[in-house]
Amino acid sequence: MGTEEKMTRSDIDLNEPAFYNNRELSWLAFNERVLEEAIDERNPLLERLKFLAIFSSNLDEFFMVRVAGLKDQVKAGFNKPENKAGLTPKQQLRQISERNHQLVQLQDRVYTETIIPMLSQHGIQFLTFDELSDKQRSFLEKRFDHYIFPVLTPMAVDAYRPFPMLLNKSLNLAVVIKNKESDSREQLAIVQVPSVLNRFILLPCEDGKNQFILLENVISYFIEKLFKGYTVKSVSPFRITRNADLPIHEEGARDLLREIEKELKKRKWGAAVRLEMQEGLMDPNVLKLLLDVLEIHKNDVYSLQGPLDLTFLFKLYNRLIVDYEHLTNETLIPQPPEDLIGETNIFDAILKRDIFLHHPYESFQPVIDFIATAAEDPQVLAIKQTLYRVSGDSPIINALARAAENGKQVTVLVELKARFDEENNIQWAKKLEKSGVHVIYGITGLKTHSKITLVVRHHNDEIQRFVHLGTGNYNDSTAKLYTDMGLLTADEEFGIDATNFFNHLSGYSEKPQWHHLSTAPFEIRDTFLDLIDQEIECHKQNGNGHIIAKMNSLTDKPIILKLYEASRAGVRIELIVRGICCLRPGIPNVSEHIRVFSIVDRFLEHSRIFYFHHGGDDKVFLSSADWMTRNMEKRIEILFPIYQQSTKRRIIEILTITLLDNMKAREQNQFGQYRYVKRNPSEQPVQSQLTFFDMASRFSDSEAE
């Protein structure tokens, strides 16, 4: 290394903003990758439709939480740059608005110019009133009179009746009317499009096609029926998004459950952060009024050619897949886990060896069976579990309730602060309490995000402890859609760690000394930093330093700085980060040995895996935590090692195959841009998610033979 290069390297300030991606803009880049899936012609048509809905749903939450938070900072006069890319809240809002308008316009074009015409080719059509037959018009008028009209409530806006407080994410019609009998000025009324009614209406059609019309179009057409004696001058559809981040004051709350219930009611009425309208249909005077009443800036107005709120496409997808299965992905059935083939009793199987689970390729059912069996087993004394997000009719909740009714000691930490699942979790908490479960409502100032279950069993005068640790939620619905990993073990020291973990959550004990676990908000960041430091030392000695880390998001600056340090030392680093990534790879003398990949495919990549070559003595860890500051400091998380060699080999193979993906993988360049990984003509196509399903199916089939 020359003197000049040495000087260049030592002079580099790793805090330079150019070495980082802004968190919010990086998230928008992720949502752009979601939109790319709607554009990708290799995806079946109805799957592309669903990705448009996912893009919209993601964006709603982004505005309700992230944009709303930045706006609150600006209102409070906070102008300090964030600690990575160095952007102030105002600068972030400006760049978010600019990029978002581009992406929303692209989504709008994809829907109106690509997806809708392609649906029409398959006999799926969305019609306007001009395109309806007389029979269809007659059908809709009856439908309106009998089913829609009774649900509608026109809300006049005048000196005595102020502008109504409109619900978050509600679709509304601003109706300008004029009295037929007088020369009085025009008046305004608001009609909310009822969310209790289906957004699309199937029309009678004699040629076998599936023809639909949107609910707001029907209401607009017959709207004069709501305003007898008035002429309707204009109908302007619009939608507002509000601040929905809950400011929970935990320190002063005597009852956290009641405090959250109280704040949930306010969520519907937060400050407006976005206004969406349909191009060509918005009355200019109405727009001016909306901007004034909602206190919204013009930069926060989004004008679309197509319909507002494409999240209705989720329901349309579910309606169409019955008749158009050929336009969807092939159904993939989760297989029996490799480690449980031939086993009949879950506890006997775990006593033989650690059980590794790879969802959704391997079924989530063994996790449900683990808890359900424990609930009925007379030898089980206690069950303890953390719950962050669960499904609507959760078999796990039912099993826990049954266990308590069977006289077992059941303790469940239900995280009431799981964003947008608060209401659901409150209901489950109440149900569990009624069944006799001891429910803990989270920890003050922290979210319990760890995924852990402890079953204590009495057998042959001995106490056995069985532990499940995972990267994903105890949610049987999302377990079919998210990629996650889990471990079932009867290792005595893991059992002791699990016992101490739950005692720490439920009581007043100091942080325990762990045998194997690392936890947040305590030592988890230090553990990661130490592991990277060890890899740097191994590389200096052996020249083969290698780190592979897979996660949802990477934002934590101390970890990014340590990764830059490792890269500068020559350690090869491969990161698989689905969402936000504030680290920039490939920067000379900073991150030139780091590569960053993102996979967006039919399943949501959710597993957190950490591999360190460690001079040939491979170290593998799984975790509930991403490399995000909130996971390090504001959540209760668990990092756990994998010791069983066969499981280690499987996880390393999974990481290797993921890095070979040349169908759905994108790679980030040094400027923060993502591009599809290019496949050479000589290379075999690798779509890692399908490869994992093939592997699970082949193993299951071979064992069955």
From Swiss-Prot:
Active site location: 449
Coiled coil ranges: none
Entry annotated with the keyword Kinase: yes
GO-annotated cellular components: polyphosphate kinase complex
Entry keyword annotation includes Ligase: no
Residues spanning the membrane: none
Keywords in alphabetical order: ATP-binding, Kinase, Magnesium, Metal-binding, Nucleotide-binding, Phosphoprotein, Transferase
Residue sites binding Mg(2+) per the record: 389, 419
Family, per entry: Belongs to the polyphosphate kinase 1 (PPK1) family.
Role: Catalyzes the reversible transfer of the terminal phosphate of ATP to form a long-chain polyphosphate (polyP).
Protein name: Polyphosphate kinase
Taxonomy of the source species: Bacteria, Bacillati, Bacillota, Bacilli, Bacillales
GN (gene name): ppk
